[in-house]
Amino acid sequence: MKNDDEQSSLILAVIGIIPVIWFALLVAPYLSSGLMGILEGVPEAMNHPFSIQLCGDSVKTVLIFLLAYGMGIGIYLSTKKHYRRGEEHGSAKWGNVKKINRRYREKRFTKNKLLTMHVRISYNMRKHLRNVLTVVIGGSGSGKTRFFAKPNLMQANTSFVVLDPKGENLRDTGYLLEEKGYEVRVLDLINMEKSHCYNPFVYLKDDNDVQRLVTNLFKATTPKGSQSNDPFWDTAASMLLLALIFYLRYEAPEEEQNFPMVMEMLRAGEVREDDDQYQSPLDELFERLEMKNPEHIAVKYYKDYHSGSAKTLKSIQITLAARLEKFNLSSLAALTATDDLDLPSLGERKVALFALIPDNDTSYNFLVSILYTQLFQQLFYLADHKYGGRLPVVHFLMDEFANVSLPDDFDKILSVMRSREVSVSIILQNLAQLKALFEKQWESIMGNCDEFLYLGGNEQGTHKYVSELLGKATIDTNTYGKSTGHSGNYSTNYQNTGRELMTPDEVRMLDNRYAILFIRGERPILDEKFDILKHPNVGFTTDGNGKPYLHGAVDRAVASISLGDSLEGELTDDALESEDYELLSDEDLEEIIQKYV
């Protein structure tokens, strides 16, 4: 802005030379008559401004006037002051709600993301040059679900991925979404028998995806704040898991590529501490694979794992079994045996995927963490290879964001999301949660999101952060003085000072009807929270007396351990119908392997 002002001043100064020369030429004929002649001639010259007469003094007069003009410009510039009246201590003020809304909204109401009652933003990022990544912070009871999550689901204008503690959003808006033509899919970790199935193996496109899956699984199953004194055991356990997954990926039929089968293989890998030469059925399986293909990636990882003593191998297996112990539960084994979610379809069809998690138990949240990571990769791949880098919009509503482990480079993932037309709403109770999750990257995450919506709360650090974002304003103050005595008098002094637009304690006292909204490049907005009862689609939801959405069970079956189609001939019909299984003896296994190979 300063450079623009200097450029404008320079242009005006150059333009000013023209009238100076013109006036000098008008005065030149009177120069020889002295000062009195000039004073008498100027009115005459001004009465006939276009009667310019060149004379011997014309050049000299022009030079004198230009010199005087230049000196005047120099004096002006040397004494020029930069005043910002009324902004001496800060220029913060509230933004105009109507003007800001007009800049960012689509005229059609349902084409927008709802932020407050009177401010909405288009999903078309090229319209306003802002991303549609939003951080929403509000304490318990501030209306994160009612005033933000549900109204945006009711828009029914994107594909949705919703982290839904307690299943409230699904119950209240699922019927509406189906009425609007959505396929509603549910990963239900509260009542797993009602859940659609999710098998992470289905979305492994290459070896790098396998590495990501194992890395994310170990990170997501590590308790918050815990640190391992010896990372050897986790590293070795991850090598064993990689060996098992790679074996299933390249050697097993599709129906056996899942975590329940990983658990079967792990249980088949018996280790006898008193017998280093003992070969378990799992050892023999990998030995046969090595004979077939010594360079097989599963063999490489298995040999790396198997290079220790029997006691060490036993400890490694126990470490891995502890990481995967949840898959021993029949409910989770059934849920992960097959896949119904069809993740890539979120970028191509109207799909609403709800991940229901208990609000009082984080035991199974690691599965949502894996789901998020695979979703990001699937959508990015689809955007790059089918849609030229820009997907039809997918909106991640990440309620209770702090309850799910995410990759350490989530701040970089946010940057990639913006360019792929993926919208994210990170919903937190306070800023401390984000700092705890991403101690070093939390500021980068906040900076990557062009919208920040504050709904109220009681966390002091958040109050201070919001107050600092609002900035300082310049206000007028006055002081009064009084002197007593024989000639006493009163005096009043007026002056300017600065104060925060809202101090931290004023932020804490924010009326529960209002929210504070920040949009990058705009003044802060104080506006009412969105009234869900005024949404045109409220009649399809339970808030508008619509019927609740009830999701049912999905047929599925857990695969049994098998080494090939020929195995079926060894089993009776009764055995095939039974869900029970048992590990075969070494002799039986050897006989079957010989037939299979």
Predicted regions located by residue number:
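Short, surface-exposed polybasic-aromatic patches that bind anionic ligands, especially phosphate groups
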Residues: 530-531
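Basic- and hydrophobic-enriched, low-structure N-terminal and domain-boundary segments
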Residues: 1-142, 146-151, 484, 494, ...
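Polar low-complexity intrinsically disordered regions enriched in Ser/Thr and small residues
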Residues: 19, 37, 89, 93, ...
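P-loop NTPase motor domains
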Residues: 130-422, 437-441, 447, 497, ...
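A broad, low-specificity signal for short, low-complexity segments enriched in glycine/proline
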Residues: 93-101, 112, 116-126, 146-147, ...
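Extended hydrophobic/Leu-rich segments
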Residues: 35-46, 109, 483-487, 503, ...
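Short alpha-helical interface patches
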Residues: 48, 59-112, 207-217, 261-268, ...
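Conserved ATP-driven motor cores of ASCE-family P-loop NTPases powering translocation/secretion/packaging/pilus
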Residues: 414-516
